[in-house]
């Protein structure tokens, strides 16, 4: 294996995936949320640079091509499981997350079944946009969980209406509130909208891969 900089970035991104979960094991919230968000964003940035540098420096390799989608899937799956757990099992989050996880398992199974023919299921531009949408949505959802925990601390038992009045009166920290429902609500709803968009792209790309693999799934007569 060639330990080029692009390959090292890919390996680091793969290691960052379980690292996001580790943040919640060793740190209390909201620090765990902020550390997980920071680590996730840094890892997501490497997803752009490893491929870009590999093409720029002509260091593309089979190892990098194999590991890159695995690192992406590991990041997305682990992060979504964590966010879903800390969201209180919000059904508006569970549905798109279930679709995303099902698609990832399904496509991975297709690739394994096709074996040498798996090269037919090349990563498309739409699939890259799908991954980007997933990562942006996850980052915003992590932001929402962190802000929600901070606002819970800042409110100290107040209702949102009481908290909003306290902010207006200068008796509460305005940085932790964007109005009646707080910053976390805006971040969470934006993240949910993006994760539904990502789920739609996930379904479309999954169907495209299945359509391409279908001729090889028929029994020979």
From Swiss-Prot:
Assigned protein family: Belongs to the CDP-alcohol phosphatidyltransferase class-I family.
Pfam families for the chain: CDP-OH_P_transf
InterPro entries from the UniProt entry: CDP-alcohol_PTase-I (IPR050324), CDP-OH_P_trans (IPR000462), CDP-OH_PTrfase_TM_dom (IPR043130), CDP_ALCOHOL_P_TRANSF_CS (IPR048254), Phosphatidylglycerol_P_synth (IPR004570)
Classification via PROSITE patterns: CDP_ALCOHOL_P_TRANSF
One GO term describing the cellular component: plasma membrane
Primary site of residence: membrane
Keywords in alphabetical order: Cell membrane, Lipid biosynthesis, Lipid metabolism, Membrane, Phospholipid biosynthesis, Phospholipid metabolism, Transferase, Transmembrane, Transmembrane helix
Membrane topology qualifier: Multi-pass membrane protein
GO biological process assignments: phosphatidylglycerol biosynthetic process
EC number, UniProt record: 2.7.8.5
Source species of the chain: Cereibacter sphaeroides (strain ATCC 17023 / DSM 158 / JCM 6121 / CCUG 31486 / LMG 2827 / NBRC 12203 / NCIMB 8253 / ATH 2.4.1.)
Compartments, as annotated in UniProt: Cell membrane
Classification via PANTHER family: CDP-DIACYLGLYCEROL--GLYCEROL-3-PHOSPHATE 3-PHOSPHATIDYLTRANSFERASE 1, CHLOROPLASTIC, CDP-DIACYLGLYCEROL--GLYCEROL-3-PHOSPHATE 3-PHOSPHATIDYLTRANSFERASE-RELATED
Main function: This protein catalyzes the committed step to the synthesis of the acidic phospholipids.
GO molecular function: CDP-diacylglycerol-glycerol-3-phosphate 3-phosphatidyltransferase activity
Organism superkingdom: Bacteria
Name of this chain's protein: CDP-diacylglycerol--glycerol-3-phosphate 3-phosphatidyltransferase
Keyword Transferase found: yes
Keyword Transmembrane among UniProt keywords: yes
Reactions catalysed: a CDP-1,2-diacyl-sn-glycerol + sn-glycerol 3-phosphate = a 1,2-diacyl-sn-glycero-3-phospho-(1'-sn-glycero-3'-phosphate) + CMP + H(+)
Recorded metabolic or biological pathway in which this protein acts: Phospholipid metabolism; phosphatidylglycerol biosynthesis; phosphatidylglycerol from CDP-diacylglycerol: step 1/2
Residue stretches spanning the membrane: 8-28, 34-54, 75-95, 133-153, 187-207
